Amino acid sequence: MKITFAKVLLGFILLLGLIQIIPVDRSNPPVEEEIAASSEVQAILKPACYDCHSNETIWPWYSQVAPVSWLLAWDVHEGREELNFSTWNRYSPKKRNKYIKESWEEVEEGEMPPWFYLPLHPEASLSYQDRTVLREWAKSVLTPNEDEDED
Protein backbone atom coordinates (compact mmCIF):
# COMPACT_ATOMS: atom_id res chain seq x y z
CA MET A 1 0.00 0.00 0.00
CA LYS A 2 1.36 3.34 -1.03
CA ILE A 3 1.19 6.07 1.62
CA THR A 4 0.55 9.36 -0.04
CA PHE A 5 1.28 12.82 1.23
CA ALA A 6 -2.46 13.43 1.57
CA LYS A 7 -2.86 10.42 3.87
CA VAL A 8 0.06 11.51 6.05
CA LEU A 9 -1.36 15.03 6.22
CA LEU A 10 -4.82 13.71 7.11
CA GLY A 11 -3.31 11.51 9.85
CA PHE A 12 -1.41 14.48 11.25
CA ILE A 13 -4.54 16.65 11.28
CA LEU A 14 -6.55 13.89 13.00
CA LEU A 15 -3.82 13.43 15.60
CA LEU A 16 -3.66 17.18 16.18
CA GLY A 17 -7.44 17.20 16.64
CA LEU A 18 -7.39 14.27 19.05
CA ILE A 19 -4.74 15.74 21.34
CA GLN A 20 -6.97 18.77 21.90
CA ILE A 21 -9.09 16.70 24.29
CA ILE A 22 -6.22 16.33 26.77
CA PRO A 23 -7.00 18.82 29.57
CA VAL A 24 -4.52 21.52 30.55
CA ASP A 25 -4.61 23.49 33.79
CA ARG A 26 -4.80 27.17 32.89
CA SER A 27 -6.10 28.30 36.25
CA ASN A 28 -5.17 31.45 38.09
CA PRO A 29 -5.41 30.88 41.84
CA PRO A 30 -6.45 33.89 43.94
CA VAL A 31 -3.89 36.62 44.51
CA GLU A 32 -3.08 36.73 48.21
CA GLU A 33 -1.43 40.13 48.27
CA GLU A 34 0.46 42.27 45.80
CA ILE A 35 4.17 42.74 46.27
CA ALA A 36 4.91 46.07 47.92
CA ALA A 37 6.37 48.17 45.13
CA SER A 38 5.75 51.56 43.58
CA SER A 39 3.38 51.88 40.64
CA GLU A 40 6.44 52.49 38.44
CA VAL A 41 8.00 49.18 39.50
CA GLN A 42 4.66 47.36 39.18
CA ALA A 43 4.28 48.76 35.66
CA ILE A 44 7.58 47.07 34.76
CA LEU A 45 7.09 43.80 36.66
CA LYS A 46 3.55 43.04 35.46
CA PRO A 47 4.17 42.82 31.70
CA ALA A 48 7.68 41.41 32.05
CA CYS A 49 7.23 38.87 34.86
CA TYR A 50 3.64 38.23 35.92
CA ASP A 51 2.53 35.89 33.12
CA CYS A 52 4.88 33.21 34.50
CA HIS A 53 5.61 34.39 38.03
CA SER A 54 2.19 35.24 39.47
CA ASN A 55 -1.38 34.04 39.70
CA GLU A 56 -2.35 36.75 37.21
CA THR A 57 -1.33 34.94 34.04
CA ILE A 58 -2.93 36.29 30.89
CA TRP A 59 -3.41 33.13 28.86
CA PRO A 60 -3.06 33.91 25.11
CA TRP A 61 -5.23 32.26 22.47
CA TYR A 62 -2.51 29.76 21.59
CA SER A 63 -2.58 28.45 25.17
CA GLN A 64 -5.78 26.70 24.07
CA VAL A 65 -4.04 24.69 21.33
CA ALA A 66 -2.13 21.49 22.11
CA PRO A 67 0.76 20.78 22.10
CA VAL A 68 1.66 24.47 22.65
CA SER A 69 -0.80 24.57 25.57
CA TRP A 70 1.17 21.84 27.34
CA LEU A 71 4.41 23.79 27.05
CA LEU A 72 2.84 27.03 28.26
CA ALA A 73 1.12 25.37 31.21
CA TRP A 74 4.41 23.72 32.17
CA ASP A 75 6.35 27.01 31.88
CA VAL A 76 3.81 28.84 34.05
CA HIS A 77 3.75 26.02 36.60
CA GLU A 78 7.56 26.04 36.81
CA GLY A 79 7.67 29.85 36.98
CA ARG A 80 5.17 29.96 39.83
CA GLU A 81 7.05 27.21 41.67
CA GLU A 82 10.29 29.17 41.39
CA LEU A 83 8.88 32.60 42.29
CA ASN A 84 5.30 33.75 42.67
CA PHE A 85 4.67 37.46 43.19
CA SER A 86 1.06 36.65 44.16
CA THR A 87 2.25 34.80 47.26
CA TRP A 88 5.17 37.13 48.07
CA ASN A 89 4.12 37.61 51.69
CA ARG A 90 4.42 33.87 52.36
CA TYR A 91 8.17 34.13 51.86
CA SER A 92 10.44 34.84 54.82
CA PRO A 93 12.66 37.95 54.64
CA LYS A 94 15.62 35.66 53.88
CA LYS A 95 13.81 34.05 50.98
CA ARG A 96 12.64 37.44 49.65
CA ASN A 97 16.24 38.67 49.70
CA LYS A 98 17.34 35.55 47.84
CA TYR A 99 14.62 35.99 45.20
CA ILE A 100 15.34 39.69 44.74
CA LYS A 101 19.07 39.07 44.30
CA GLU A 102 18.59 36.11 41.96
CA SER A 103 15.92 37.92 39.94
CA TRP A 104 18.07 40.99 39.51
CA GLU A 105 21.04 38.86 38.41
CA GLU A 106 18.89 37.11 35.80
CA VAL A 107 17.51 40.42 34.51
CA GLU A 108 20.98 41.97 34.36
CA GLU A 109 22.38 38.94 32.51
CA GLY A 110 19.50 39.02 30.00
CA GLU A 111 18.09 35.66 31.11
CA MET A 112 14.76 37.14 32.17
CA PRO A 113 12.42 37.60 30.51
CA PRO A 114 13.47 34.62 28.40
CA TRP A 115 14.36 35.23 24.76
CA PHE A 116 11.63 32.89 23.52
CA TYR A 117 8.93 34.86 25.36
CA LEU A 118 9.76 38.23 23.84
CA PRO A 119 8.76 37.76 20.16
CA LEU A 120 5.10 37.24 21.10
CA HIS A 121 5.26 39.61 24.10
CA PRO A 122 7.32 42.65 23.07
CA GLU A 123 5.80 44.61 25.98
CA ALA A 124 7.88 42.39 28.30
CA SER A 125 11.15 43.66 26.86
CA LEU A 126 13.11 45.63 29.46
CA SER A 127 14.73 48.89 28.42
CA TYR A 128 17.84 50.29 30.05
CA GLN A 129 15.58 52.63 32.04
CA ASP A 130 13.39 49.70 33.17
CA ARG A 131 16.45 47.79 34.36
CA THR A 132 17.71 50.89 36.19
CA VAL A 133 14.37 51.29 37.98
CA LEU A 134 14.34 47.60 38.94
CA ARG A 135 17.94 47.74 40.16
CA GLU A 136 17.23 50.76 42.38
CA TRP A 137 14.07 49.12 43.71
CA ALA A 138 15.94 45.88 44.43
CA LYS A 139 18.63 47.80 46.33
CA SER A 140 16.00 49.64 48.35
CA VAL A 141 14.09 46.53 49.47
CA LEU A 142 16.97 44.21 50.27
CA THR A 143 17.07 43.51 53.98
CA PRO A 144 20.57 43.97 55.37
CA ASN A 145 22.22 41.12 57.26
CA GLU A 146 19.77 38.48 56.06
CA ASP A 147 21.50 35.17 55.43
CA GLU A 148 20.82 33.52 52.04
CA ASP A 149 21.01 29.90 53.18
CA GLU A 150 17.26 29.35 53.25
CA ASP A 151 15.61 27.53 50.34
Where are these regions (language model features)?
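Extracytoplasmic electron-transfer domains, predominantly the class I c-type cytochrome c fold
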Residues: 70-120
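Short cysteine/histidine-rich zinc-coordinating motifs and their immediately flanking basic loops
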Residues: 61-67
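Electrostatic cytochrome c docking/interface patches
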Residues: 25-45
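Hydrophobic membrane-insertion alpha-helices, especially the h-region
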Residues: 6-23
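Extracytoplasmic/periplasmic C-terminal soluble domains
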Residues: 74-80, 144-151
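The canonical Cys-X-X-Cys-His
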Residues: 45-57, 112, 134
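C-terminal capping alpha-helices of c-type cytochrome domains
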Residues: 110-111, 118, 122-148
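Extracytoplasmic/secreted proteins, especially bacterial periplasmic and envelope-associated proteins
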Residues: 40, 44, 67, 71, ...
